[in-house]
Amino acid sequence: MRPRRTSTRLVLTAAALGIRAASTALPADALRLASSLYMLSSPPQLVALVTGGGAQLAPWLLATPGASNSILEFSVPYAKASLAAVLGHDPPQSVNAAVAESMAERAYERSVALGGGERSVGLGCTAALRSEPMRRGEHRCYIAVRSAAGVHCLALTLAKGARSREAEDAVVARAALATLARACGVNPPPLPGGGPFWKLASDDPLAPEVAARLDAEHADETFVAT
């Protein structure tokens, strides 16, 4: 007589495992701006390369309806060797305008190779943000967007110590999205308080000295036609 076989199905929920559900809320204004890009008569055919910060840009772009008609590829060459492989050389310093422009150029070439044609757009973003232990130098990012028209660049210096790492990353993602939008002829809306689209407040109530540092933040933007 064959032995009887039994099976038990165990279903574990996140709550049973003690795992807290992460918030999936995405900034509505960022999604609206991404949607504006996708609704263009000729939406950009985007390849993006991001390292060091600004990775929150990926879910903002990909969670917006219409992404499949515009986003070709989004990559994060985070390791030094990975970035060197993308650029074709190992830069002595990875967070500067030249690296951002090289990343944008490689991304643009990739978009062309994937069939983007005249709508090909390449975005490069490199950043140095809050870390543990605290970083010695400035918290900053460099963003470049390459299109058939030319190269749009943004250099942004953040107020050191005013934000969490997550908030700094969101600022960089916003700056990248705003630069991309302007390169495509879409003006990003200002924040409700009248500040630039990329700017975010500190996680905690702002002390006067923190507010002053945030007010002192600056961004330098340039465009060079091809």
Regions found by a protein language model. Name each.
Residues T24-W198:
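Short alpha-helical segments enriched in small residues
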Residues R4-A21:
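Terminal signal-anchor or tail-anchor transmembrane helices
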Residues R4, G54, A216-E217:
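Glycine-centered flexibility motif
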Residues P188-T226:
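Non-catalytic propeptide/linker segments at domain boundaries
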